[in-house]
Amino acid sequence: MLRLPPIIVCFLSCVVFQSQAQTKVVGECAITYDIHQIASNGDKSLVGQKQIFIKGNSCKTILKTPAFTQTLIFNTQQDTAIILKEIGLNKFLQYILYASMQPVNLVASKKNGTISTILDYPCETITLSSADGNAMEVTYTTVIIPTVTVYEQAFKEIPGLVMRYQLTTKEGNKILYSANKVDLSPITLNVFEVNKSNYQQIN
């Protein structure tokens, strides 16, 4: 019987281990994106920020702009979601059917073959095209993937954590979301709680 030297056996074991390595599923994380509008000449202007909080099946997104703040809270195992909107001193609360958040109707996807590094995470890029004529260039890492990916419906099939995405409308308008922070610390449950007495409920 052929006997392999210990060093070769160790090397082969490492190769097998690496080939079987899978993307790590992260049950709790927070991601912050800076939002830039891109002019036709390529100039960028900061127009807002988007924060994502994920814990298990629960997700909270906060979109902040100079004009308003909008929050979406949902659980992928529940039928309803909550939208909070703050415009000046006015605060509104609305319940919506989570099922009504329909996935984007994608008609094509193409990997760009571009390899980059964002916040020390190795990333690759894919371009998604939808039936309405819009396109989204998504840069993501396969090192980790959150338990909830549908904080943007187009991300449902992305096999990792999205670090940057650029939306280009059929009219040519461009909005860029770039992660400036990824925090894998535990998320407390009160992040998803809402003091409903502070809001006016609307239909």
What are these regions (language model features)?
Residues 1-26:
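Bacterial Sec-dependent N-terminal signal peptides
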Residues 23-203:
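Extended soluble regions of mature proteins
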